[in-house]
Amino acid sequence: MPTINQLIAKGREPNKARNKVPALQGCPQKRGVCTRVYTTTPKKPNSALRKVAKVRLTNGYEVVSYIPGEGHNLQEHSVVLIRGGRVKDLPGVRYHILRGVLDTQGIAKRRQRRSLYGAKRPK
């Protein structure tokens, strides 16, 4: 425990908040190319086959990102846009792929929360 004099001389150093999405480098989104598209299983209480893609970004980072929604058209060499946002039951998945942008198609029959899934307004 420091003395009063030590605190006056040096003070306390505040804890630095760690970056949750380092690969974005402060940008809202980043572009990348899919190097592998596959499914993986979630952590303990849940059970599913979650769709994920390994993406090489324009800044050289390689990250695993989640493909949201039902069905997708992604394959190797697809160009995608990723945003931050982790998937709680998939360890190591800290990014989401944006639907309806670049090579990723939106979801056709989507009625609610359409903006998140790149779906046009139904007639």
Curated annotation (Swiss-Prot):
It comes from the Bacteria. InterPro entries: NA-bd_OB-fold, Ribosomal_uS12, Ribosomal_uS12_bac. GO terms for molecular function: rRNA binding; structural constituent of ribosome; tRNA binding. GO terms for cellular component: small ribosomal subunit. Keywords: Methylation, Ribonucleoprotein, Ribosomal protein, RNA-binding, rRNA-binding, tRNA-binding. With S4 and S5 plays an important role in translational accuracy. Belongs to the universal ribosomal protein uS12 family. This is Small ribosomal subunit protein uS12. The gene is rpsL.
